[in-house]
């Protein structure tokens, strides 16, 4: 476990504790300013908030004779030539590298992109990648994050270039939107972003949602409506109505119709059963290692979900 804050994903920490109780050896590597209650771990190492220790672990794997045919391996090995692995790093490299099955768990919006790249290098060089219980578990920030990726929504900031109109659903980003000619916001509260909007459409929260979420391990989790929010449209109905105005038909009567289309369009979901893991093991399509320079280990990203932030503020903080 490397780059982890329990407050962000308490259920994952519980799963790790259960794994330790079942006999798994759990090792925590975290920046010193982010100490965690991991009493169940076999080993805990708190390090500087940089990549030096992870590089020591990577060098420790090379010293064990680990290698890879992946593109970029020679460059990574050369970048680690002057690194000397300390005793803690050697111990962790040996434990991880020699294990029959091993997983690395880290939080997507907690570690830096450079740290994530180095973690991927470590996994590929060790050979622990792409088979059941043998790879990387990148813990997402939100309950719908994995589902969005599966639906093909992967565009980055470059997608905003030249955009003049924006439809924002459930997000409250700290961004300069002054260059837009039109802004629509759909949210549960009058957020700062909503105050700048030309049109605001009341949205519904998770508490009044019907359907499923796809969690980090690709397990379909059903949700049932618990609260009746007095709004004209549910979230999916807002999208369908907007599409209709642009003469794009979304012929759905309910969430079941959406599920049927997902089954038809997305192979991973075709035979997925609620509560079961599906498509959880993905081997790299083309493993490409990347030499990483100096960077921070952790640099947590602020959430752009207003309701999530409100709830987080009211939760009791660990002592």
Task: Give residue spans per PLM region.
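Non-catalytic alpha/beta scaffold blocks inside enzyme catalytic domains
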Residues: 1-273, 319
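Long, low-complexity segments enriched in small/aliphatic residues
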Residues: 115-120, 255-319
């Amino acid at each position: 476990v490397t780059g982890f804050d329990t407050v962000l994903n308490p259920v994952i920490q519980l799963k790790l504790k259960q794994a330790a109780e079942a006999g798994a050896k759990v090792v925590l590597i975290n920046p010193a300013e982010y100490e965690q209650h991991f009493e169940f771990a076999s080993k805990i190492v708190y390090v500087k908030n940089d990549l030096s220790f992870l590089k020591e672990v990577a060098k420790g794997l090379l010293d064990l004779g680990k290698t890879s045919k992946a593109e970029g391996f020679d460059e990574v090995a050369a970048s680690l030539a002057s690194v000397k692995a300390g005793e803690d790093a050697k111990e962790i490299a040996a434990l991880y590298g020699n294990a029959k099955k091993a997983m690395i768990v880290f939080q997507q919006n907690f570690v830096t992109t450079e740290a994530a790249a180095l973690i991927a290098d470590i996994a590929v060089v060790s050979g622990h990648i792409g088979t059941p219980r043998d790879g990387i578990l990148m813990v997402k920030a939100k309950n719908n994050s994995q589902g969005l990726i599966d639906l093909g929504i992967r565009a980055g900031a470059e997608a905003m270039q030249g955009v003049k109109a924006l439809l924002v659903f459930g997000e409250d980003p700290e961004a300069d939107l002054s260059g837009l000619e039109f802004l629509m916001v759909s949210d549960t509260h009058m957020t700062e972003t909503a105050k700048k909007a030309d049109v605001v459409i009341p949205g519904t929260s998770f508490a009044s949602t019907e359907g499923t979420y796809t969690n980090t391990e690709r397990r379909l989790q059903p949700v049932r409506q618990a609260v009746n929010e007095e709004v004209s449209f549910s979230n999916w109905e807002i999208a369908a109505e907007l599409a209709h105005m642009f003469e794009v038909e979304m012929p759905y009567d309910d969430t079941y119709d959406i599920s049927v289309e997902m089954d038809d369009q997305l192979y991973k979901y075709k035979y997925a059963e609620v509560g079961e893991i599906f498509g959880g093991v993905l081997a790299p399509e083309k493993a490409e290692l990347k030499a990483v320079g100096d960077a921070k280990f952790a640099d947590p990203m602020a959430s752009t979900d207003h309701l999530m932030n409100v709830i987080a503020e009211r939760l009791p903080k660990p002592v």
